[in-house]
Regions:
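Short, solvent-exposed interaction modules
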Residues: 107-127, 134, 182-211
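A short, structured beta-strand/loop element
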Residues: 31-60, 124, 133, 138
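Extracellular/lumenal glycan-associated surfaces
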Residues: 30, 34-36, 80-86, 134-137, ...
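Cysteine-centered iron-sulfur cluster-binding motifs in ferredoxin-type domains/subunits
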Residues: 24, 70-80, 118-136, 148-164, ...
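Non-heme iron-sulfur electron-transfer modules
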Residues: 18, 25-26, 40-42, 46-54, ...
Length: 241
């Protein structure tokens, strides 16, 4: 088991700037991060059965320049920062075309009603981090959510989902129940950027995606739902560290 099995305590986390944070996706290029957004690391914590049960905080990166650029092509030699490797990459190595829809989540999500709780699932956002699979999966649990123990498991699992694929609310058409995060970006081990705290993501054409509390941005360069992660980094065995 990892040295820690508790969730990250976001209380008292340092706020880096009062300026509005923002991430701009450059055409066939990097992510440009402004607003002095904290850049850190996060690691999954596993139990003895190798099931992910929590997130562990890692060290912060020292940010010297503002704004800063994060690698999007997966080829930089200075990961997670961009070194302009995308400019010399071949077409087979890198295609930064944005493919993710700007349509609201409500147009794609599946709704799973339960007793006193509603779960929604926007599957295209899945990054494959598997918090949803414990206790027989959240899709099975929702049918028994009137049981307080099952309800506690499900709400924790949904909240741990880094991509925001899963959300829950207390009533249909209610507001999603979310942990309040400071705006920050967490680099996941050999995986995507975990964007927390409702940071706007601006596409190369200037359109801003619907703002979400939990988002995963592709770092391997091969997602079919760019700029968002679709779990392809697992399939290609992406190695950044």
């Amino acid at each position: 088991m990892s040295e820690s099995n508790s969730q990250i305590d976001e209380q008292g986390a340092q706020t880096y700037s009062s300026h509005p944070p923002r991430i701009v996706v450059q055409p066939n290029g990097a992510y440009v991060v402004s607003g002095k957004v904290r850049l850190t690391r996060r690691f999954r914590v596993f139990n003895d059965d190798r099931e992910p049960i929590a997130w562990r905080a890692g060290e912060d990166f020292l940010i010297v320049d503002e704004p800063y650029k994060l690698c999007r092509c997966g080829l930089s030699k200075t990961k997670p920062f961009c070194d302009d490797s995308h400019e010399t990459a071949s077409e087979s190595e890198w295609n930064g075309t944005i493919t993710a829809s700007h349509a609201p989540r409500s147009t794609r999500q599946k709704i799973y009603p339960g007793t006193g709780l509603v779960m929604t699932d926007d599957e295209i956002l899945c990054g494959g981090y598997a918090f949803c699979d414990r206790f027989g999966t959240v899709w099975a649990e929702i049918e028994h959510v009137s049981d307080p123990a099952v309800r506690a498991h499900l709400t924790e699992q949904v909240s741990l989902c880094p991509s925001g694929r899963l959300e829950y609310m207390l009533a249909l058409n209610g507001a999603p129940v979310e942990i309040k995060y400071e705006p920050m970006i967490a680099v996941l081990h050999n995986g995507p950027y975990w964007v927390l705290g409702g940071i706007p993501i601006e596409a190369p054409d200037g359109q801003v995606y619907p703002v979400r509390n939990r988002q995963l941005l592709c770092r391997c360069g091969k997602s079919k739902n760019k700029p968002f992660c679709d779990g392809t980094h697992w399939d290609i065995h992406f190695r950044a560290e």
